């Protein structure tokens, strides 16, 4: 087969799905996986069959694609702004159970205005647990919740957070951040109860923090995504081992212009340029070449991967497999996944960032 291409080990995917579902089930917590990690209908349906309560998406476009593939309970973990998006949200909410993230009263009011002739739209308040991206500060959540309760056509279901700063942490800090993430939203729930505001969902989520989130009483849902794959960043964080990484990039050595340097046919358009999302670099190079630990993918052009090494190296024409740094980005750059060299899975929601 021609390279570069993405290879999937189905057995590892199935094991990763089962282990995360077992973790959630054992704590009587719902698992609502984030499908932005794979954007693939086959994997989504494997997750739902294993027991997931629904799915999480980053964008409305992903929600539309996944609904066509069978998803019925969808959380859009992103603020929806603009008339065109609201038109699409109303249409989707007529055929699926949709919940939307909010962190702003004005945005929520404009969204609710579109649901006068339908059932109310469910919302979760996003709480900032340290990422400093979207989300209200914890001590502002009560005021927003009280305001949302006065908005017609809106149903406040709960609160959620994402401690994405964990990707800039050292492995030793992952547990601490996971507990902090969970305690933050549980504390918000407790504060709401003092005002007789009862919510059903207290949601946290990331692959590194999931197993620590479930240690905190009061969390009702986790939303990891990358766990289906795992990748070099997860390995660098100490969250996974290379043997738990289900996605690899197959590439071919196409040049060896001088001693200590070779070139592969996978560049930034395949491997991405991610070396750690939120600060600390926990990876070396642009992926791990399996079986060749002394090789470093030092730099990328669009179609070239420049590899440096000391000692032995693969020859021109030889194929190598690479565990990417960030699997979610790599999948979004591809059209297809080759599964155990027997099946072809489409990346159905590729490019659906709309």
Would you name each region that the model predicts?
Residues 34-167:
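Active-site-proximal beta-alpha core segment in soluble small-molecule metabolic enzymes
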Residues 12-43, 56-58:
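N-terminal glycine-rich anion-binding loops that anchor highly charged ligand groups
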Residues 121, 128-241:
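Active-site loop/helix belt of alpha/beta enzymes
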Residues 260-354:
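C-terminal accessory subdomain/extension
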Residues 29-30, 192-201, 316, 332-334:
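Flexible, glycine/charged-enriched surface loops at secondary-structure junctions
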Residues 13, 36, 66, 125, ...:
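Conserved, mostly hydrophobic/aromatic
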Residues 209-288:
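Active-site loop ensemble at the mouth of alpha/beta enzyme cores that anchors a bound cofactor
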Residues 1-8:
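Generic N-terminal amphipathic, Lys/Arg-enriched alpha-helix
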């Amino acid at each position: 087969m021609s390279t570069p291409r993405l290879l999937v080990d189905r057995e590892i995917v199935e094991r990763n799905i089962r282990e995360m579902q077992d973790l959630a089930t054992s704590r009587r917590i719902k698992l609502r996986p984030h499908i932005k990690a794979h954007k693939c209908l086959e994997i989504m349906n494997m997750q739902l069959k294993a027991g997931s309560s629904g799915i999480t998406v980053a964008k409305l476009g992903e929600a539309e694609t996944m609904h066509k593939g069978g998803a019925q309970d969808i959380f859009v973990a992103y603020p929806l702004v603009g008339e065109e998006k609201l038109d699409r949200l109303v249409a989707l909410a007529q055929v699926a159970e949709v919940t939307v993230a909010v962190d702003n009263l004005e945005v929520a009011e404009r969204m609710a205005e579109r649901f006068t002739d339908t059932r109310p739209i469910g919302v979760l308040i996003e709480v900032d647990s340290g990422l400093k991206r979207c989300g209200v500060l914890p001590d502002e959540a009560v005021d927003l919740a009280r305001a949302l309760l006065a908005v017609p056509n809106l149903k406040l279901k709960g609160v959620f957070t994402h401690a994405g700063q964990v990707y800039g942490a050292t492995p030793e800090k992952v547990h601490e951040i996971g507990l902090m993430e969970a305690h933050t939203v549980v504390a918000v729930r407790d504060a709401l109860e003092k005002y007789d505001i009862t919510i059903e969902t207290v949601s946290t989520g990331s692959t590194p923090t999931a197993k620590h989130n479930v240690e905190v009483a009061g969390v009702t849902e986790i939303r990891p995504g990358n766990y289906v794959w795992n990748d070099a960043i997860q390995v660098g964080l100490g969250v996974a081992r290379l043997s738990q990484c289900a996605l690899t990039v197959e590439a071919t050595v196409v040049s060896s212009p001088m001693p200590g340097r070779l070139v592969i046919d996978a560049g930034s358009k395949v491997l991405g340029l991610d070396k750690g999302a939120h600060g600390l670099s926990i990876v070396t190079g642009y992926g791990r070449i399996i079986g060749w630990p002394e090789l470093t993918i030092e730099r990328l052009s669009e179609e070239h991967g420049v590899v440096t090494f000391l000692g032995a190296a693969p020859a021109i024409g030889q194929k190598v497999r690479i565990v990417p740094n960030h699997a979610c980005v790599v999948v979004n750059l591809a059209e297809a996944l080759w599964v155990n060299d027997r099946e072809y899975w489409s990346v159905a929601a590729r490019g659906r960032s709309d």
